[in-house]
């Protein structure tokens, strides 16, 4: 079973289907804390009464999406990430010039932080609009891609320290 991270439009993320540690691996809580390097407060939500324990899940602050997803993919081989996007399909100029990975608009993160205009139409000072329905997108992050992404961020961080 592949673990799934569900990132709703608002609120904390759910990490479902995450296997327990094997051998000398740290607990899942410790893995989250190590991955984020921050004060993270993962909360375990028990499975409904009578259901198997594996139907329980972790709840984590959404700002830890990248770090937690990479840690799970590196340990388990891959993780699926279910991301929910706004039903109003509005993409904001602030999205295109943003830093970080928090995007809930209808661009599905494609234009987040890269100032890409695509087929968006300017409406007012900051809002861009395109018509369509609501979206849920599931992406898979593999161990190889997670390690490459983590290494690239580390190299960029080191480069910035040297400047």
Predicted regions mapped to residue ranges:
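Accessory DNA-engaging acidic/polar modules
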Residues: 1-163
């Amino acid at each position: 079973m592949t673990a799934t991270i569900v990132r709703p439009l608002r609120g904390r993320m759910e990490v479902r289907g995450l296997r327990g540690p094997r051998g000398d691996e740290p607990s899942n809580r410790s893995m989250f804390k190590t991955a984020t390097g921050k004060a993270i407060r993962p909360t375990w939500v028990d499975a409904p009464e009578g259901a198997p324990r594996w139907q329980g899940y972790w709840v984590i602050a959404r700002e830890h999406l990248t770090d937690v997803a990479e840690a799970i993919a590196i340990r388990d081989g891959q993780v699926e990430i279910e991301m929910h996007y706004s039903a109003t399909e509005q993409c904001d100029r602030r999205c295109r010039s943003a830093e970080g990975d928090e995007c809930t608009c209808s661009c599905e993160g494609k234009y987040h932080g890269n100032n890409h205009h695509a087929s968006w139409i300017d409406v007012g000072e900051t809002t861009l609009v395109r018509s369509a329905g609501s979206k849920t997108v599931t992406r898979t992050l593999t161990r190889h891609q997670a390690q490459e992404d983590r290494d690239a961020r580390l190299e960029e961080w080191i480069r910035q320290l040297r400047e």
